[in-house]
Amino acid sequence: GIITPEHSSMTWNGDAFPFPSWEADQDLNSAMQNSVNWYFQAIDSQLGINRVQEFLNKIEYGNQTTSSNLDLYWSDFSLKISPLEQVTLLKKFNTNEFHLNFQNVFSVKNAIKIASTPNGNFYGKTGTGRVNGQDINGWFIGYVETSDNSYYFATNIQSDSNATGKKAFEITSDILKKLHIWN
C-alpha cells in the first residue's frame, strides 16, 4: 500500500488551500478529521486510476464510476452512492467482509472515532460537496457500537446552499439521542 498504520505522514507542498487545516503536514488521522483532499488525491495519484477503479469495484462503492481525472472523481459527481449503499459498505468494512489488512481497518476505525464511553464507541465521517462556492451536499456516515449492538447510519442533505457535513452530523446526533442510542 501507499500508506501503512505506522507510516501515513505526508508533507504539505506549500500550496494555498481554502481551509487553514489543509495547509500543514498530514497523517491519516488529521486528513480524515479535516477532509484534506490533497492527502487523498496524493494517495490516488500514487495508486493510479486502474488500482483506484479496482478497489472501488472490489468494495462495490456506489456506481463505481470515476472520471479520468483522479483529482476530481470525488468532487465532480461522477462517483455516486446512496445512503443505503453507504450503510451497507460501512457495515461490510467494519466486519471486514472485504478481507482487508486488519491493521489498516483498525487504523481507519481509529481515524473516524468521534467518541468513546463505557457504554460504547461512536464512529463517523462528514463530507461536504461544494460547487461554485456553495455547500450543496452534506453527508455524515458512521455507526455506534455498544456492548450488545451496532447501529449504522448515513445522513445526506442537499440544498442550494448551507448543506454541510456538519449539519448532517447535527441532524444525526439529534436522532441518535432521541432514539437513546448515543448521548
Predicted regions and their residues:
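Tryptophan-centric aromatic hotspots in well-structured domains and transmembrane helices
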Residues: 12-13, 74, 139
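Active-site SXXK
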Residues: 1-10, 31, 153
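Structured C-terminal helix/loop/strand segments within mature extracytoplasmic catalytic/sensor domains
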Residues: 45-50, 91-183
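Mid-domain, small-residue-enriched loop/turn segments at the edges of structured enzyme/sensor domains
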Residues: 20-24, 28, 40-95
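Short helix- or helix-capping micro-motifs
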Residues: 28-35
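Acidic helix-start/capping segments at beta-turn-to-alpha-helix junctions
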Residues: 8-21, 30
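Extracytoplasmic
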Residues: 5-7, 23, 38, 56, ...
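Surface-exposed patches in mature extracellular/periplasmic domains of secreted proteins
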Residues: 5-12, 43-44, 64-70, 97-105
